[in-house]
Regions:
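Acidic, His- and aromatic-enriched active-site or binding-groove loops in soluble protein domains
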Residues: 1-10, 50-78, 83-86
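Conserved structured core elements
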Residues: 2, 6-13, 22, 27, ...
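Sec-exported extracytoplasmic/periplasmic mature domains
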Residues: 13, 17-24, 110-114, 202-210, ...
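Short helix/loop capping segments that flank catalytic or ligand/cofactor-binding pockets
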Residues: 41-42, 49-50, 55-57, 153-155, ...
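Cysteine endopeptidase catalytic domains of the caspase/legumain-like
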Residues: 188-191, 209-235
Length: 235
């Protein structure tokens, strides 16, 4: 981790020096963040039980359970017949070849949650509250499996110590740094959204953030404490 921090620090220093040499440092708003986090942050929590479909095969009732068979055979008929898929890492995404079996498979997963390192199974109406309906949009999996924190469904035994793509706190929360000579030092612990970055950039450029359709539809605001009395000025 220290190596990564040192490399990032050196890269930012080069960037800042270039801005200063060009005489535009004072007029530049620097925003540093990440598109995703990693999980687990705590290495002591790391568990790698194997790929999800392989793990299903280790459950004692696997051979006699339809739900288990559907998962392990999801991709067998691709591309000749009905095609499903299981995508895993620090989350499990399951597309079923027969979507009418969604509840049956979800029930199986819930019944065997401890053996499969499952914290939550999302399907049906609950899934549609957050994502598009998988019956009408094939990009949405039929079932989403959120594993117990620290679990990575992988066959890697050595190199993989963290992953991203899931819904854990470490996956979905990242740091965000905003810098400009006009801004005093401040630590803000109020949660913000990375979707606020675009609106903030527009405001700093003197453009009404509501010009963005997403700002209007989702009620997105600019990042707080930047355009206060002693902060940045609109262009």
């Amino acid at each position: 981790m220290q190596y990564g921090l040192d490399k990032t620090d050196a890269a930012l220093w080069q960037f800042i020096n270039a801005l200063k040499n060009a005489g535009i440092y004072d007029q530049t708003l620097i925003i540093v963040t990440s598109k995703h986090g990693q999980s687990p942050i705590n290495k002591a929590k790391l568990v790698k039980p194997g790929h999800f479909a392989d793990l299903v095969c280790t459950v004692s009732n696997f051979a006699t359970t339809e739900g288990a068979s559907i998962i392990t055979n999801a991709g067998n008929n691709c591309p000749e017949g009905p095609c499903g898929w299981v995508q895993d890492d620090d989350i499990g995404l399951i597309w079923l070849p027969d979507q009418s079996k969604t509840k049956l498979v979800a029930d199986y997963l819930n019944q065997n949650a401890p053996a499969l390192f499952i914290d939550e199974v999302m399907s049906g109406e609950e899934l549609k509250l957050k994502f598009r309906d998988p019956l009408t949009d094939s990009r949405t999996p039929d079932i989403i499996v959120q594993p117990v924190y620290g679990t990575i469904y992988t066959g890697s035994t050595k190199t993989k110590i963290a992953e991203h793509g899931g819904f854990s706190f470490g996956d979905t929360n990242v740091g965000l740094i905003v810098s400009n000579p006009a801004l005093g030092q401040k630590v803000v612990k109020t949660p913000v959204l990375t979707s606020q970055v675009a609106a903030t950039i527009l405001k700093a450029l003197g453009i009404d953030p509501s010009e963005l359709e997403s700002v209007r539809k989702e009620g997105i605001t600019v990042l707080p404490f930047l355009f206060d009395q002693d902060g940045l000025e609109d262009e």
